[in-house]
Amino acid sequence: MIRYFTAGESHGPALSAIVEGMPAGITITPKEINTQLARRQQGHGRGGRMKIESDKAEILSGVRFGKTIGSPITLVINNRDWQNWTTTMAQFEKPDEQCSKITIPRPGHADLAGRIKYGFDDIRPVIERSSARETAARVAAGTVARLFLKALGIEIGSYISAIGSAAEASPDKQLEGLLLEGAEAVARQADLSPVRMLGKETETNALAAIDGASERGDTLGGIIEIFITGVPPGFGSYVQHDRRLDAALAAAIISIQAIKGVEIGTAFENARKPGSEVHDEFHLSREKGVIRKTNRAGGLEGSMSSGQTIHLRAAMKPISSLVTPLLSFDVETLQATPSRFERSDTCAVPAAGVVAEAVLAPVIANALLEKLGGDHLDEIRQRLDLYRESIRSTFHS
């Protein structure tokens, strides 16, 4: 089983991740991880932090001669901004007079509940760990799993379909063509846009919406479309709740900071229709075997992969730190006061798409290993090839 843990504070010395359970024999370089980290930093509407950081990952263990060796992989990303926070985030020295406590929670953030939960008299520790800066470590960890999947013909990609009220209808023909190449083709096309959108008109509207929100001291959320191609049918299980692939994928998406909703396929549209207009019918093809002409289920049926493209949609709320503050209160004086501003983005939806790709990779990798087993890439590839061939021979005349 692949699992990973992250550590580090937003303005601490570094972020780190330990990835355990990765099979041996996977080719990996810092360059591939750094490419994904750079993608995470892109997007119109990002804040001043992105001008400071230039995220690079260092691999400290689990790799020899450019290949994984089956032992835990340690990844470290240094925080360049740490040099400006050595007093506020000192690990051992006592705070001086300049290190004032934060006692005003921001609506929509972890501030108040985190302070209550851990008994802090200062909200700063809550801000530091709940920050979406942590997702840099998750992108690094997820990239390792992505490289494993890519070596087996499984790809993950995303694009942004809405930012604020700037939304585009599904670009069906363009999307269909890209997905035939693999999900990464969707991501490559999206990355050409500063808001990771596929339609030019919607991109223009989104850019204007972000600029308008920035001028007003406001923030914007949006909708992320994520695709996974190359997954054969039968990954996951209906037998127990904790083996359901749809549940694991949804949990991974909803674990991303500021993500408040997840949809599989066209689930919410399906809920308004009769079953005769929803379920993806089977068709038999002499050349292709069993095919579907629709994919409203999003590539998941009975909590297992169906063999179609897996499609998830994530809803990201507007970021909680606003230049124009909402109403809050001081937890020490219990006096009403405007909320405080913590340096943040106007819109981070494009970056969240990259994070979504990363967090789904370990989920698919675990479903694959649960089905096939194996400790070395060559062993697993051989088993997957046999599994795919058994499916092909069963349904082809």
From Swiss-Prot:
Keywords: Amino-acid biosynthesis, Aromatic amino acid biosynthesis, FAD, Flavoprotein, FMN, Lyase, NADP
Assigned GO CC terms: cytosol
Keyword Thylakoid: no
GO molecular function: chorismate synthase activity; FMN binding
EC identifiers of the protein: 4.2.3.5
GO biological process: amino acid biosynthetic process; aromatic amino acid family biosynthetic process; chorismate biosynthetic process
Catalyzed reactions per annotation: 5-O-(1-carboxyvinyl)-3-phosphoshikimate = chorismate + phosphate
Record Pfam families: Chorismate_synt (PF01264)
Cofactor binding note of this UniProt entry: Reduced FMN (FMNH(2)).
Recorded superkingdom: Bacteria
Pathway membership: Metabolic intermediate biosynthesis; chorismate biosynthesis; chorismate from D-erythrose 4-phosphate and phosphoenolpyruvate: step 7/7
Major enzyme class: lyase
Reported cofactor(s): FMNH2
SUPFAM superfamilies: Chorismate synthase, AroC
Residues where NADP(+) binds: R40, R46
Binding site for FMN: R129, S130, S131, Q257, A258, G302, K317, P318, I319, S320, S321, R343
Assembly description: Homotetramer.
HAMAP family xref list: Chorismate_synth (MF_00300)
Annotated family: Belongs to the chorismate synthase family.
Protein's job: This reaction introduces a second double bond into the aromatic ring system.
Name by which UniProt lists this protein: Chorismate synthase
The organism of origin for this protein: Pelodictyon phaeoclathratiforme (strain DSM 5477 / BU-1)
